[in-house]
């Protein structure tokens, strides 16, 4: 059975995107090791509410590592110290008694702070609206099974489609680049017959929108790949670059 731990929790507080932020420090006592990180935040918020204080605002939804909304920067890592896991999949057993845990929001010009630990990630939605879809007629439901796709290609497309759009890649990147996200969304369609028809338009449109929204460029530090909770490979960025160059040559 996991032991209870006590630790110091430093949490970033900020009223809005234009306001100056600061850290608040809390002493957490006897938190069970099998408590998830978000459950620990719930415990803290319950204490704050009981004391008549403002609870900490943070984003969450499924709490199962699927939705990507639990965007917290924990001790210098997007989603915390674990590999291949989101914040909601982190348990307090990963920390030691007496630790100091620092929690911040994603830091990026493309993700302005809404309040405290919650950021506005609607920029990703705008990038997807620019071209992250198939608009051509692809036939009825049975037709998909009639199109042969080699298993290695299907596997690559599925690996790219594992991206949950959480924004950890942007938070990890020193340039605030969204290239891993964009490349995953481009790759999952460019690899399949249904997506090839609009491949050129898609690559140009999504990269253009990424630049327009203030995200930086990729300089191959691979920090995004190291911190991605779904282990999306930067080989997708190479594919995106090939797709973009091929599209520009057709202009």
Name every feature range the model reports, one short phrase each:
Residues 4-27:
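Eukaryote-biased recognition of intrinsically disordered, low-complexity regulatory segments
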Residues 12, 29, 74-76:
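Short strand-turn-strand beta-turns centered on an Asx-Gly dipeptide
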Residues 24-36:
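Short, contiguous acidic and Ser/Thr-rich linear segments
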Residues 35-54, 101-251:
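Ferredoxin-type iron-sulfur electron-transfer modules in oxidoreductases and energy-metabolism complexes
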Residues 57-69:
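Short, structured protein-protein interaction patches enriched in aromatics and acidic/basic residues
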Residues 66, 72-74, 224:
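Functionalized membrane-embedded alpha-helices
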Residues 74-98, 103:
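Glycine-rich phosphate/adenylate-binding loop and adjacent beta-alpha elements
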């Amino acid at each position: 059975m996991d032991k209870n731990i006590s630790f110091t929790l430093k949490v970033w507080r900020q009223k809005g995107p234009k306001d100056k932020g600061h850290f608040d420090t809390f002493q957490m006592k006897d938190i069970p090791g099998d408590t998830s990180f978000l459950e620990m935040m719930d415990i803290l918020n319950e204490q704050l509410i009981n004391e008549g204080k403002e609870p900490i605002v943070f984003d969450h939804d499924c709490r199962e590592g699927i939705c990507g909304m639990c965007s917290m920067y924990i001790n210098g890592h997007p989603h915390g110290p674990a590999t291949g896991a989101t914040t909601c999949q982190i348990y307090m057993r990963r920390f030691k008694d007496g630790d100091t845990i620092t929690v911040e929001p994603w830091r990026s010009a493309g993700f302005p702070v809404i309040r405290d630990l919650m950021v506005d990630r609607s920029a990703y939605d705008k990038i997807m609206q620019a071209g992250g879809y198939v608009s051509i007629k692809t036939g009825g439901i049975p037709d998909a099974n009639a199109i042969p796709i080699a298993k290695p290609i299907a596997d690559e497309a599925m690996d790219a489609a594992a991206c949950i759009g959480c924004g950890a890649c942007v938070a990890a990147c020193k340039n605030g680049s969204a290239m891993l996200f964009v490349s995953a969304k481009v790759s999952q369609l460019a690899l399949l017959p249904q997506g090839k028809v609009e491949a050129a338009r898609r690559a140009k449109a999504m990269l253009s929108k990424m630049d327009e929204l203030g995200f930086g460029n990729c300089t191959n530090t691979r920090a995004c790949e190291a911190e991605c909770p779904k282990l999306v490979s930067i080989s997708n960025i190479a594919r995106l670059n090939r797709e973009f160059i091929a599209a520009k040559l057709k202009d």
